[in-house]
């Protein structure tokens, strides 16, 4: 999907560093940083099911970010992953499982564990408590990479006002809540809506894509 949006994924660490400095965003393709991931990729693809690498991948972030929002596919992983992130130096973060999805979800309640300076706080997050509506899996379903790229652009351009937009508001709102001092989660969701409605989010996406293209040519 990112490639359909114009993002170049196969950048070197030095190229990604320039993109990050310019835009505040970069995509770190695991196989480019952890050679073992490249070796096992064909096996993982052939198996067609989750493996230990679905758990290890998010924990091997080469950026060593101290703030992270991490989704897991099973509720039983929420607390262990939060503990590992804290042990790895994450001082502000959240691990979330949304009704079997590895992200915050509008399908139902979300089991989360918030990380703040070594303290782990588990709780359930109900989207309806933040003005968001519950939905079905079908309402969130995407399609091909090309179709998903168009859905993304429609949301960021304000043409999509349904469940998919609210799913983005929830997840982006959590990230803003974690990353900006003094915000409540409700503030984060409101801020996410403002950034989309103002066109700032779409402009950032376009600038990010352009920056990766420029870096690839340099």
Language-model features: locations:
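Glycine-rich anion-binding loops and their surrounding alpha/beta cores
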Residues: 3-10, 15-218
């Amino acid at each position: 999907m990112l490639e359909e949006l114009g993002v170049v994924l196969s950048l070197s660490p030095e190229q990604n560093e320039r993109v990050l400095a310019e835009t505040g965003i970069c995509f770190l393709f695991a196989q480019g940083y952890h050679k073992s991931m490249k070796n096992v990729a064909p096996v993982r693809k052939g198996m067609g099911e989750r493996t230990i690498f679905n758990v290890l991948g998010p924990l091997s972030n080469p950026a060593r970010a101290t703030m992270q929002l991490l989704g897991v596919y099973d509720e039983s992983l929420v607390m262990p992953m939060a503990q590992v992130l804290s042990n790895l130096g994450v001082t502000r973060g959240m691990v979330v499982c949304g009704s079997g999805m590895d992200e915050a979800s509008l399908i139902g309640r979300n089991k989360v564990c918030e990380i703040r300076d070594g303290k782990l706080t588990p709780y359930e997050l109900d989207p309806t408590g933040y003005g968001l509506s519950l939905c079905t899996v079908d309402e969130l379903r995407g399609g091909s990479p090309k179709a998903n790229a168009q859905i993304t652009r429609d949301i960021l351009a304000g043409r999509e006002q349904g469940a998919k937009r609210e799913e983005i508001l929830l997840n982006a709102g959590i990230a803003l809540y974690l990353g900006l001092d003094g915000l409540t989660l409700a503030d984060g969701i409101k801020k996410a809506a403002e950034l989309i409605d103002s066109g700032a989010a779409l402009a950032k996406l376009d600038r990010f894509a352009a920056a990766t293209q420029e870096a690839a040519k340099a």
